[in-house]
């Protein structure tokens, strides 16, 4: 009985890695060994940055809210505290969207926060 060396399995595995490495520069998309290393690293970056993206967006929203709050005479922390005292539960994503796209509505929320801080 002839010996089976698993050539089709190996070829399939290598083709899968080279397919994932499509678009990489130079030997990183041509040579299996280099491509495999780069694909593993790329998957690690992707895993890490899916979590980092959530933090980055939260930072962006807070920066936008803070800028709009200061235009209304409040700091970010005082605005958020005032809204909490007023019982207004609006998340940072929506607040940042209001700050950018609907300044009048954001100003109303800032005024409500000011009133509740002064009580």
From Swiss-Prot:
GO terms for biological process: ribosomal large subunit assembly; translation. It comes from the Bacteria. GO terms for molecular function: rRNA binding; structural constituent of ribosome. GO terms for cellular component: ribonucleoprotein complex; ribosome. Keywords: Ribonucleoprotein, Ribosomal protein, RNA-binding, rRNA-binding. Pfam families: Ribosomal_L20. CDD domains: Ribosomal_L20 (cd07026). Binds directly to 23S ribosomal RNA and is necessary for the in vitro assembly process of the 50S ribosomal subunit. It is not involved in the protein synthesizing functions of that subunit. Belongs to the bacterial ribosomal protein bL20 family. NCBIfam families: rplT_bact. This is Large ribosomal subunit protein bL20. The lineage of its organism: Bacteria, Bacillati, Bacillota, Bacilli, Bacillales.
């Amino acid at each position: 009985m002839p010996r089976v060396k698993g050539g089709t399995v190996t070829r399939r595995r290598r083709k899968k890695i080279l397919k994932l490495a499509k678009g990489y520069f130079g030997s990183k998309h041509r040579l299996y060994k280099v491509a495999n290393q780069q694909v593993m690293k790329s998957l690690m970056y992707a895993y890490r940055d899916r979590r980092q993206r959530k933090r980055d967006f939260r930072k962006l929203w807070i920066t936008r809210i803070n800028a709009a709050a200061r235009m209304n005479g409040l700091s970010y922390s005082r605005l958020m505290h005032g809204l909490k005292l007023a019982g207004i539960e609006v998340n940072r994503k929506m607040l940042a969207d209001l700050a950018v796209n609907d300044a009048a509505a954001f100003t109303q929320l800032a005024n409500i926060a000011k009133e509740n801080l002064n009580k």
